[in-house]
Structures are given as structure tokens and as C-alpha cells.
From Swiss-Prot:
This is Suppressor of tumorigenicity 14 protein homolog. The keyword Cell division does not apply. SUPFAM superfamilies: LDL receptor-like module, SEA domain, Spermadhesin, CUB domain, Trypsin-like serine proteases. Residues 1-55 are cytoplasmic. It comes from Mus musculus. The gene is St14.
Length: 855
């Protein structure tokens, strides 16, 4: 007992005095007390040291100290840093060409799997021993899976190496090898190994890779569809700080089609978001990653992926504690394509990337040889083109691409045409081992080389447009070639410095229509000046300086800086009565008011889905893309007007929708039904759609049914809505909110897709722009009031039509929130040139809305 206590005490507190060369304590030696006595000298001057000798001694002592320090440092380096090792882990795969795949290899606990895995590990060890920079530092390897072809082994290898050899090891492992290993041990038969490749991974992933607590293996059977989900889906969130994986297999000579039906994980951010990755392999190697996913996708988003062989690996790595349901996915097998491409010999036709509109598979090459009659030329028009790789700079076609006439095309491109000067053209499509996309949809056409666009104008891209669109001031060709080298009509056109022709009423409208700014030069205010809303010109330096230099406050509106200024109709007023110089400060994610009132009541304007589907031909909206859009149905008449949700109990619409006529009492709230969360008018009973009756209708008391001034109405719902992924409110702007000319805004509704056409079944969307108020008044004199705003394209083509009345104008503001800029009111015709749509301006009636709804 005493001995143990002595060792314990010694371990915690040592007698450091025993280790000192000199000790101030007196020691008992041989039983006697010893000391040191200094005797006085007979002649002090003789024994006194001379000055110069002292310096020699000091230098010697200093030199000795430095030498000892250097030796100590070298010893520390030798015994500590020289022995430091860096952990390197590599994921890889190899092919065993003289083996046949057995079904038992799918089960990692089977005798056959264990036996073959042991031999592969021994083969890897022998292989590394052949490389001087690898063999001495190889710690261990492990086989994680096998798949067909003859037999592909997936493995990881761990090395412990000196830091100065790290790069050499990386280079050695990056070499793809083809080797034959003779039997050097009893347990190792002769292996012919090809395609021995490996890629570095984060060593921290090794522990997660070895954890099988959230690992699943699934095999497709026949044509059946197999479903799998994250743990707990959809009733509880997936586990935090975990790694889950799904090994998906199909039969030999098949490929897999994988679709995520529902996808909701933590948002993508820079803080290490949760991540789902799909690999065209059974090893999580970056060069074989097909896609990485995070965030929330709408159900209609294209999340279908094809493998190049009969396996997929899906991993979920969670780094956050945020609670999300995860995903639901399905997969099935289909026969592997024996060839891709082909010979096309009709006068016209279509072709696409493999499995379009699903993502094309990795590692594929397709060639289409197109031949039309000898007396005709051929051109290819790509109607849709998505070949985007997240790791490739725009314009660099080094991975996935389409090649025609020696030129490569990649990325995301709008419709374009490639022509041949003969009756033949060859289109080649290539995808590498990683990251795939939707691909392309194309058509080929034959044409007369002497007249490629009969009776029409041909853009340099090969597109044909009507001749009257040439030099009309609007770019109808994607490359603007229809507006170049024009002679402008001085009566109604302005000649830009870049030789473009623009309508005269676009001059000095505060929008750079020419592109070079020449249509805004020489206007009422000189260069370097600011034009106040009252027409006064000020030096640019006086804008946003905290002083009302204009006299109407407009020089202090829309400022990035935040200053407390005198209150005007242009300044934002906080709840405490103070006014800010900053423009549109409400709900922008930054607290500007000292009382925080600018960031209150901001549960609005955000979509539940962070990822929306691409517009693939047409203007159909996506599910949940406009969750504040409402469809109003009149009894026995179906959809008549639109509306927007601004709170659980209130809608905003247009007053003219509720004016009685001799046949129907539209002002009677009992005649109306509101559908929220609706996308397709033919599926009003679909899951997520809420059908509600109205409680009352409030039209603006100043509404004029002749001029449509003050065209706005408030609708109270009979009961509160339930917010969901497809039902959310839009933000209402402050009375001082500014939607400047040129700003992009979205119009939505089920109205007619063209003038005189029928209503759409699927919710439609169109991007339009705010038009300068002066220009608007010039286009429609004596018709526009301060409560109205013009929005659209003066070139026509996109507009709201009958049936969209009462629907919202949605404007994306700071922080990504959507604010309602206006209400669809009226217009002359539908999508006509110089006839933009007219909308009720929301900020002007904001106080009236708040008075009646409290919103």
C-alpha cells in the first residue's frame, strides 16, 4: 500500500532538485556537512582579472549557449518532428479480369466475399511493395464492395507517411496500373488486375466509412420499382452528424434509373450543409460523383439520374442539427444501351441526349450522322441545351460537350442553330465520368442554300424571323443581328451610338435602352447629376448625404446608407416615428430602425422550395413556385380572377372582378370560392390544394369602373388558411417602397396564353419589366393615373391577359423575398407592342390595406 502511494506521488510531483547541477540546499555527504569557504588574497591587484579577458569569457559563454541551443533544437527535431507522420487515405477500385462475379459477392458477410476480399488486400499489399514510396508506409487496406465487370473491387487504403513525401505518395497513387500478380503466398492465386485507380479522401471520412449503422443494400428485381427513404421519412428528421449510404444494384448488363420523388434536406450554405451525393460507382470517389444535392426541391424538379453500369452509391452526410425530413427515392433497372446515336436520313427530324429529359448517364459517347437530299443543306437547331458541370468554367468544354464541325458546345445555352454548307452534318456528344445534366433536345432540317429563310430574315445564328422585325428597335435574333447596320427612321426612331435603332419615346426615360447609354445622354440633367422627382437637378455628390437637397426628399430615398432624416413621402418611417434615408429597408434581413420595426412581420415572400425547375420550353409555373397565387372561381363559371395571399385571413385582388352585371351578382361573396396551393385547374382536389369560401369583399371606395382607377379589393376568408410548402403569403411593400423603371417583375395567372386564346390549365408565369411612368403616359395619354403603373415589354410578347385580373406582380427584393408590386388591372389587347399591361400600384394603397386588414 505504501509503495503504491509512493509511486502515485512520484508520478504527479517529481523532485526536480535532484536533476539540478547546483543546489542551494546543503547536502549530507558521507555523514558530514560540507561547505565552501573563500579565503582573502594576499595581493588583490595580482589576482584581479583584467577587463579584456572578461569579454573573451562572455563571448565564449554566449557561443557555448548558442551551440547548446542549436544542438537541443536538432535533438528535438530528430526525436519529435522527424517521426511525425501524415495520414493519407485513398478510395479506389480495380478490375480483376480473370474472375467471374458471383451473387455471393453482394453480401459482405458471405464466405466468398471474405475470401476474395482477403486476396485483394494481399494483392494490394504486394502491389504497394513494388513501389518504394508506397510499400514502407502502407498501414492497411479494406475491400468495401464488389460488382460485375468481370469483378470490380472497391477498396480504401491507408498510409502513414513523412510529411515531405506526401506529394510523392499522391503522384504514385494517381498512376493507373495494369498488373499481373503471380502467386507469392499460399492464399493468393494469380490475379490479373487492370484499371487500378485511387483518389485521395479526407481521413476523417474513414471512420464514417467503416460505420455501417446507417448502411443499406438494395437490388432491383425485373422491371419492379424499388423505393427507399432516409431514416424516419417523412414523419421525423434524418439523424444529425451521421453518414448514411444506399448501395443500389441491378442485374448484369443493365443500368439504373434513380429518381428523387421528394427532397428536403438542410439548405445549402457555407457552414457545411447536409449533402446527398450520387456516385456512378460503389466507392465514394469525387471523379465518379454524378450529382451533389442540398436544400429543398420542388416535386416537379428533374431529379432523375442514369448510371453507366449496374450500380449506384447514394450517400447522405449530415453536418448540422437542423430538422428536415430528408428524401424519398425510387430506382429500377433497364437494359444497357447497345449503341448511342445513329444515322438520320429524313428531310427533318428530332434527336436528343440519351434518356432525355432525365440526366444523361456518365461516360458515354454518341454520334449522329445526318444526311438530307443532295440538293439541300442541313442545319441543327438546339431547342433546349443543358450541359453544365459545376467544376468547369463557363465556355470551357473540357468535360461534357456537343461537337459539330470541329467546334464544341457546352454549358447552358438558349436556342441556337448550327448549319452545314452541305447535305451532311455530324453531331457528337460526349460525357465524362462525373456530373451529368439534363442534356439537349434538337431538331435537324433541310434547307435551300440559296434561300435558307424563304420570305424571312435569317439571323447569323441561323434562326429565321419575319422581315418586318428587321430594324424595328427590338432584338428578335439572339445575337441582335436583326438590329445591326440599320438605317433608323428619324420620324419615330433614335439612332444609338452603337447604330441600334430605338423608339424615340425611350429617349431620356432613365433606362439605358441602347446599351451604350447614348439614349440617356443630354437629357434634362447633365452627366454627373441626379434628377429629383420634382425635376430639379443636383450634383451627384448631394445624393444620399443625409440632407433634403431636392426639397421633396427624393435624393435621400433608395440610399444604401442608413441615416435618420426628416420624414417625407419618400422616406421610410419606423414605428417609433423616426425616418430613414435607406430605400426599401423593410424585411431585407438587416435591422435599420432602432426599434427593429423594419424587420417585424417578415414571415412572407419566401418559397418553401429552394430549388425550382428550369423552364423547359414554355412558361408553365412550378409547384410551390408562387405559393401566394390564388384562383378565384365564380359559381358555375370556373376561374375568373386571380388574387394573392397576404395573411392567413386576407387576399388582395382587383375591384373590377366584383362589379355586378345584369346576369350575375359578382359583389356577393357567397358566389366565390378561393383555391390556394393550386397549380393545375384540372386538379383542384389534388393534395395540398385548399378550397375556401369568402367571408366578405371590400372594394376601394374610390374605384372608378370606367377608368379603373383604384382597382383593388380585399377579400376576407371564411376561415384561416394553413401555411404549407405550396401556400405562403407574399410581402406587402411599404408606402415608400420604390419599384424602379427597368426592374424585372413576374406576372402569374391562368389567363389566356394569347389574345383570343383559351385559358391555361397550368399556372403561367412571365418575366416583365417596369416601364418608366412618363413613357407609360405617352403611350396611353389621358388614361394613366398615379395609382397605375405600366409593366411589360414594349416589344410585346409577354403580358397578362383576361383571366389574370386581380393576380399579383411579384418582385424579388433584397434578402430574396418577394414583394407584391401591383395588382393585374387592365390593358389594350394582350402582349401587343407598345401596349404594356396596366397594374394597380400597391405602395399607393398600402395604408388603405393596413387600415382594413391590419397587415
Amino acid at each position: 500500500m505504501g509503495s503504491n502511494r509512493g509511486r502515485k506521488a512520484g508520478g504527479g510531483s517529481q523532485d526536480f532538485g535532484a536533476g539540478l547541477k547546483y543546489n542551494s540546499r546543503l547536502e549530507n555527504m558521507n555523514g558530514f556537512e560540507e561547505g565552501v569557504e573563500f579565503l582573502p588574497a594576499n595581493n588583490a591587484k595580482k589576482v584581479e582579472k583584467r577587463g579584456p579577458r572578461r569579454w573573451v569569457v562572455l563571448v565564449a559563454v554566449l557561443f557555448s549557449f548558442l551551440l547548446l541551443s542549436l544542438m537541443a533544437g536538432l535533438l528535438v527535431w530528430h526525436f519529435h518532428y522527424r517521426n511525425v507522420r501524415v495520414q493519407k487515405v485513398f478510395n479506389g477500385h480495380l478490375r480483376i479480369t480473370n474472375e467471374i462475379f458471383l451473387d455471393a459477392y453482394e453480401n459482405s458477410t458471405s464466405t466468398e466475399f471474405i475470401s476474395l476480399a482477403s486476396q485483394v488486400k494481399e494483392a494490394l499489399k504486394l502491389l504497394y511493395n513494388e513501389v518504394p514510396v508506397l510499400g514502407p508506409y502502407h498501414k492497411k487496406s479494406a475491400v468495401t464492395a464488389f460488382s460485375e465487370g468481370s469483378v470490380i473491387a472497391y477498396y480504401w487504403s491507408e498510409f502513414s507517411i513523412p510529411p515531405h513525401l506526401a506529394e510523392e505518395v499522391d503522384r504514385a497513387m494517381a498512376v493507373e496500373r495494369v498488373v499481373t500478380l503471380p502467386p507469392r503466398a499460399r492464399a493468393l492465386k494469380s490475379f490479373v488486375l487492370t484499371s487500378v485507380v485511387a483518389f485521395p479522401i479526407d481521413p476523417r471520412m474513414l471512420q464514417r466509412t467503416q460505420d455501417n449503422s446507417c448502411s443499406f443494400a438494395l437490388h432491383a428485381h425485373g422491371a419492379a420499382v424499388t423505393r427507399f427513404t432516409t431514416p424516419g421519412f417523412p414523419n421525423s428528421p434524418y439523424p444529425a452528424h451521421a453518414r448514411c449510404q444506399w448501395v443500389l444494384r441491378g442485374d448484369a448488363d443493365s443500368v439504373l434509373s434513380l429518381t428523387f420523388r421528394s427532397f428536403d434536406v438542410a439548405p445549402c450554405d457555407e457552414h457545411g450543409s447536409d449533402l446527398v451525393t450520387v456516385y456512378d460507382s460503389l466507392s465514394p470517389m469525387e471523379p465518379h460523383a454524378v450529382v451533389r444535392l442540398c436544400g429543398t426541391f420542388s416535386p416537379s424538379y428533374n431529379l432523375t439520374f442514369l448510371s453507366s453500369q449496374n450500380v449506384f452509391l447514394v450517400t447522405l452526410i449530415t453536418n448540422t442539427d437542423r430538422r428536415h425530413p430528408g428524401f424519398e427515392a425510387t430506382f429500377f433497372q433497364l437494359p444497357k444501351m447497345s449503341s448511342c446515336g445513329g444515322f438520320l436520313s429524313d428531310t427533318q427530324g428530332t434527336f436528343s441526349s440519351p434518356y432525355y429529359p432525365g440526366h444523361y448517364p456518365p461516360n458515354i459517347n454518341c454520334t449522329w450522322n445526318i444526311k438530307v437530299p443532295n440538293n439541300r443543306n442541313v442545319k441543327v437547331r438546339f431547342k433546349l441545351f443543358y450541359l453544365v458541370d459545376p467544376n468547369v468554367p463557363v465556355g470551357s468544354c473540357t468535360k461534357d460537350y456537343v461537337e459539330i464541325n470541329g467546334e464544341k458546345y457546352c454549358g447552358e445555352r438558349s436556342q441556337f442553330v448550327v448549319s452545314s454548307n452541305s447535305s451532311k452534318i455530324t453531331v457528337h456528344f460526349h460525357s465524362d465520368h462525373s456530373y451529368t445534366d439534363t442534356g439537349f433536345l434538337a431538331e435537324y432540317l433541310s434547307y435551300d442554300s440559296n434561300d435558307p429563310c424563304p420570305g424571312m430574315f435569317m439571323c447569323k445564328t441561323g434562326r429565321c424571323i419575319r422581315k418586318e422585325l428587321r430594324c424595328d428597335g427590338w432584338a428578335d435574333c439572339p445575337d441582335y443581328s436583326d438590329e445591326r447596320y440599320c438605317r433608323c427612321n428619324a420620324t419615330h426612331q433614335f439612332t444609338c451610338k452603337n447604330q441600334f435603332c430605338k423608339p424615340l419615346f425611350w429617349v431620356c426615360d432613365s433606362v439605358n435602352d441602347c446599351g451604350d447609354g447614348s439614349d440617356e445622354e443630354g437629357c434634362s440633367c447633365p452627366a454627373g447629376s441626379f434628377k429629383c422627382s420634382n425635376g430639379k437637378c443636383l450634383p451627384q455628390s448631394q445624393k444620399c448625404n443625409g440632407k433634403d437637397n431636392c426639397g421633396d426628399g427624393s435624393d435621400e430615398a433608395s440610399c444604401d446608407s442608413v441615416n435618420v432624416v426628416s420624414c417625407t413621402k419618400y422616406t421610410y418611417r419606423c414605428q417609433n416615428g423616426l425616418c430613414l434615408s435607406k430605400g426599401n429597408p423593410e424585411c431585407d434581413g438587416k435591422t435599420d430602425c432602432s426599434d427593429g420595426s423594419d424587420e417585424k412581420n417578415c414571415d412572407c415572400g419566401l418559397r418553401s422550395f429552394t430549388k425550382q425547375a428550369r423552364v423547359v420550353g414554355g412558361t408553365n409555373a412550378d409547384e410551390g413556385e408562387w405559393p401566394w397565387q390564388v384562383s378565384l372561381h365564380a359559381l358555375g363559371q370556373g376561374h375568373l380572377c386571380g388574387a394573392s395571399l397576404i395573411s392567413p385571413d386576407w387576399l388582395v385582388s382587383a375591384a373590377h372582378c366584383f362589379q355586378d352585371d345584369k346576369n350575375f351578382k359578382y359583389s356577393d361573396y357567397t358566389m366565390w370560392t378561393a383555391f390556394l396551393g393550386l397549380l393545375d385547374q384540372s386538379k383542384r382536389s389534388a393534395s395540398g390544394v385548399q378550397e375556401l369560401k369568402l367571408k366578405r369583399i371590400i372594394t376601394h371606395p374610390s374605384f372608378n369602373d370606367f377608368t379603373f382607377d383604384y382597382d383593388i379589393a380585399l377579400l376576407e376568408l371564411e376561415k384561416s388558411v394553413e401555411y404549407s410548402t405550396v401556400v405562403r403569403p407574399i410581402c406587402l411593400p411599404d408606402a415608400t417602397h420604390v419599384f424602379p423603371a427597368g426592374k424585372a417583375i413576374w406576372v402569374t395567372g391562368w389567363g389566356h396564353t394569347k389574345e383570343g386564346g383559351t385559358g391555361a390549365l397550368i399556372l403561367q408565369k412571365g418575366e416583365i419589366r417596369v416601364i418608366n411612368q412618363t413613357t407609360c403616359e405617352d403611350l396611353m395619354p389621358q388614361q394613366i393615373t398615379p395609382r397605375m403603373m405600366c409593366v411589360g415589354f414594349l416589344s410585346g410578347g409577354v403580358d397578362s391577359c383576361q383571366g389574370d385580373s386581380g393576380g399579383p406582380l411579384s418582385s424579388a427584393e433584397k434578402d430574396g423575398r418577394m414583394f407584391q408590386a401591383g395588382v393585374v388591372s387592365w390593358g389594350e389587347g394582350c402582349a401587343q407592342r407598345n401596349k404594356p399591361g396596366v397594374y394597380t400600384r400597391l405602395p399607393v394603397v398600402r395604408d388603405w390595406i393596413k387600415e382594413h386588414t391590419g397587415v
